[in-house]
Regions:
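Intrinsically disordered, low-complexity, compositionally biased regions/tails
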Residues: 7, 11-18, 65, 82, ...
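Second-shell loop/turn segments in exported
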Residues: 36-44
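Amphipathic alpha-helical segments
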Residues: 44-65
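Generic "edge-of-domain/loop-turn" microfeature
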Residues: 26, 46-48, 69, 81-83, ...
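Compositionally biased P/S/T/G-rich terminal and signal peptide-adjacent segments
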Residues: 1-37
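Short, exposed beta-strand-loop hairpins at the edges of beta-sheets
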Residues: 73-90, 94-98
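Short Gly/Thr-rich strand-loop-strand
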Residues: 58-82
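Short, ordered beta-strand-loop transition motifs
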Residues: 29-36, 65-71, 86-90
Length: 99
């Protein structure tokens, strides 16, 4: 499953080469700070983003800690960062924080 890394998306903070998102993403809002990286997506669907994360995070050095039984939500950590993903309707968000 191919995607774009944070570096390819123009971010200066976060696990720049170790974290990716679907290549057809539509960024609605983004925060790029040393202490937090937040990305709100208007597309693709939250299910597509979650599927991408579940398929790529382990290969990128992350461990998925928890996943919601209902709906799109998960937490993960690795490469010196913790992260969370949630989605509802057509919108989803990722938050990354350094450990």
């Amino acid at each position: 499953m191919s995607g774009l890394t944070l570096r390819q998306l123009g971010f200066e903070n976060g696990p720049l080469d170790e974290f990716s998102l679907p290549s057809d993403l539509v960024v609605s809002t983004a925060v790029d700070q040393p202490n937090v990286v937040t990305i709100v997506l208007a597309g693709p669907s939250p299910q597509t983003v979650e599927d991408h994360l579940r398929a790529t995070l382990p290969n990128e050095g992350f461990t998925i800690d928890a996943r919601a039984d209902a709906g799109e939500a998960l937490t993960f950590e690795g490469n010196g960062w913790t992260g969370g993903f949630t989605g509802t309707g057509a919108t989803s968000a990722i938050v990354l924080r350094p450990v």
